[in-house]
């Protein structure tokens, strides 16, 4: 069974497969090796990937992107509140969970972020199955290193909705390190810093790679934003410039804003290789054209603070790994935003002018590593990967709430996983019969500032003064980093409680996942019906045009009655096609059958009775340049 590796990105996604001893990044149906993480809904169909992004300016309110910024978060998350300002689509609260509200087939529909992500995953799964010629169910999906438990589990849920068995969720910089280590066939021990600045998130990881096969993550740090924020700065600047020049605020118009964002994204890419980018948009707002230039220096000034922010996680990762700058041997850049020259200069300056490694494709490295890990987990015995061992770390500290709402950390951030840690606690008051254990993840001192994962009660504690009972709390994290077993045991009585934390806060219930799986199947059937409708329409249209072309070429072979019948039938069909936006497949087939019954005898008569004439006509056309000769008009040159 083939397993694929998927880099589910904020703005673009990429996937690959390890086979025949190497990784192959799979191109989508448009021939592109990255697929926009976009899903669009129209009054007739659902579009995913390139097709969705290509029509975004025409349909901004019903084209969804950035689902990764919503996944696993609560609606009232401050970061979501900030992001909503930049999105043309509507985000609503459903029991505290964010849902995306769109118009689909003239009905209002609400989708969870997991559903939108699952649609992108489904698109990649289907493409992989076509290319590989086999059913694909197993996959490794990557997430930013700084994703919390809710976000990781929600990503796993998206995979399940898409019909995938998610073998493992791995960190993006770790996957990139796998790609680098295997690609370079390293010898000896090397400390590698992965600087991953993508379309929506930012991660830094430090790994030690031993003999190109043992990959040990030493520390990880990051920011679940950045990347696309550069676009936002440029869009704001251009919108302000437009307002200053023409005294009109285009930000009130979603379509104009989307067109401006597309142009800004293109300009940002241009500025990575040129010192100036030209932005030209016809009739951007109220018939006014936008024509302006943006220099690289201006762009760097607009994003200066964001660029500087990228160095903070670098310093944090170095401190956590207990390493000095000089101990890093290689600096690997991953993610499209690392192409920005200012980012490269800042990082190079931070590391005292040492050269950066730009040798791996920043758009594909994460998917490459995910494909390798997928092959390993699915039991591939290829010599290239048989010795590869990946040792990751817990991205966030795990602990419990103690008196006063203070977080007591049991597993520290950047602790190697799998790991198991135990600490002893006691009661807060005299004769306390039980304790409520609340499990959190995060780095803040107070639990209210961290992310609650779950809670359970340990009862049956024998009466005793406060501080006397000894309660052992054990945290056990598996190699995936997303299965956490927590146990508590009162030592004198032996009473114990053991649970597996399943973070339901902000997550989908099993019933919701089952419903979404069924809906995904229904949407896939609707998509197939839509494809069949379009194919039937195209067949009918092609047939009508072919008939018209044939009889106009050989019109002298038809009687007046036949000419009239064919002309009327073809014209009526073309009018019907123009007036009917999208009928049922059966209607197209009925029209096709009716037209075929009328035209087939006439077409047969044309071709049987007019074969010589048709040949002569073609001969005259072909021979128009050489005095009517029907021989070839070109000659082979030695």
Curated annotation (Swiss-Prot):
A single MF term (Gene Ontology): ATP binding
NCBIfam families from the UniProt entry: PRK00290.1
Induction / repression: By heat shock.
Matching Pfam families: HSP70
Positions of disulphide bridges: none
KW Repeat (keyword) present: no
Name of the protein in question: Heat shock protein 70
């Amino acid at each position: 069974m083939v397993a694929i590796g998927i880099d589910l990105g904020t703005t673009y996604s990429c996937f690959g497969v390890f086979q025949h001893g190497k990784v192959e990044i799979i191109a989508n149906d448009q021939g592109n090796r990255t697929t926009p993480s976009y899903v669009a809904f129209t009054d007739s169909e659902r579009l995913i990937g390139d097709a969705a992004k290509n029509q975004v300016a025409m349909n901004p309110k019903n084209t969804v992107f950035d689902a990764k910024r919503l996944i696993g978060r609560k609606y009232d998350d401050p970061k979501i509140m900030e992001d909503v300002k930049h999105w043309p689509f509507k985000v609503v609260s459903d029991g505290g969970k964010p849902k995306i509200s769109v118009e689909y087939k003239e009905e209002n529909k609400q989708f969870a972020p997991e559903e939108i992500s699952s649609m992108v995953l489904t698109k990649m799964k289907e493409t992989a199955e076509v290319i590989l010629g086999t059913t694909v169910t197993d996959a490794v999906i990557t997430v930013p290193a700084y994703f919390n438990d809710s976000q990781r589990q929600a990503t796993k849920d998206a995979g399940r909705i898409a019909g995938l068995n998610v073998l493992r969720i791995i960190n993006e910089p770790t996957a990139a390190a796998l790609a680098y280590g295997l690609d370079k066939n390293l010898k000896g021990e090397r400390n590698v810093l992965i600087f991953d600045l993508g379309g929506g998130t930012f991660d830094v990881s430090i790994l030690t790679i031993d003999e190109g096969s043992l990959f040990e993550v030493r520390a990880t740090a990051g920011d679940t934003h950045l990347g696309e924020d550069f676009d936002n700065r440029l869009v704001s600047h251009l919108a302000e410039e437009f307002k200053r020049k023409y005294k009109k605020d285009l930000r009130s118009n979603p379509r104009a804003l989307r067109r401006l964002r597309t142009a800004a994204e293109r300009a940002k890419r241009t500025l990575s290789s040129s010192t100036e980018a030209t932005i030209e948009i016809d009739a951007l707002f109220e018939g006014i054209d936008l024509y302006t230039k943006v220099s690289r220096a201006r762009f760097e000034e607009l994003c200066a603070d964001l660029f500087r922010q990228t160095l903070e996680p670098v310093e944090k990762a170095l401190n956590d790994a207990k390493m000095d700058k000089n101990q890093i041997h290689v600096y690997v850049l991953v993610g499209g935003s690392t192409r920005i020259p200012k980012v490269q200069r800042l990082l190079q300056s931070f590391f005292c002018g040492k050269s950066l490694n730009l040798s791996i494709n920043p758009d594909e490295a994460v998917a490459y590593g995910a494909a390798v890990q997928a092959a390993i987990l699915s039991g591939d015995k290829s010599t290239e990967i048989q010795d590869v061992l990946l040792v990751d770390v817990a991205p966030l500290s795990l602990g419990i709430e103690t008196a006063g709402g203070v977080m007591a950390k049991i597993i520290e951030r950047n602790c190697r996983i799998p790991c198991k840690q135990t600490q002893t606690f006691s009661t807060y008051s005299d004769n306390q019969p039980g304790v409520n254990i609340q499990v959190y993840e995060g780095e803040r001192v107070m639990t209210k500032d961290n992310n609650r994962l779950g809670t359970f009660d340990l009862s049956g504690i024998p009466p005793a003064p406060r501080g006397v009972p000894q309660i052992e709390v054990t945290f056990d994290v598996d190699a995936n980093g997303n299965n956490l077993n927590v146990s508590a045991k009162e030592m004198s009585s032996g009473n114990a409680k053991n649970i597996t934390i399943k973070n339901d806060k902000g997550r989908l219930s099993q019933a919701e996942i089952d419903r979404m799986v069924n809906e995904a199947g229904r949407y896939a059937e609707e998509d197939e019906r839509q494809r069949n409708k379009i194919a039937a329409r195209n067949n009918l249209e092609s047939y009508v045009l072919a008939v018209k072309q044939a009889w106009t070429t050989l019109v002298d072979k038809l009687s007046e009655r036949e000419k009239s019948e064919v002309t009327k039938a073809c014209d009526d069909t073309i009018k019907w096609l123009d007036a009917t936006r999208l009928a049922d497949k059966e209607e197209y087939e009925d029209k096709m059958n009716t037209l075929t019954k009328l035209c087939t005898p006439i077409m047969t008569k044309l071709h049987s009775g007019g074969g010589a004439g048709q040949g002569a006509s073609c001969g005259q056309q072909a021979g128009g340049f050489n005095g009517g000769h029907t021989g070839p008009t070109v000659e082979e040159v030695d």
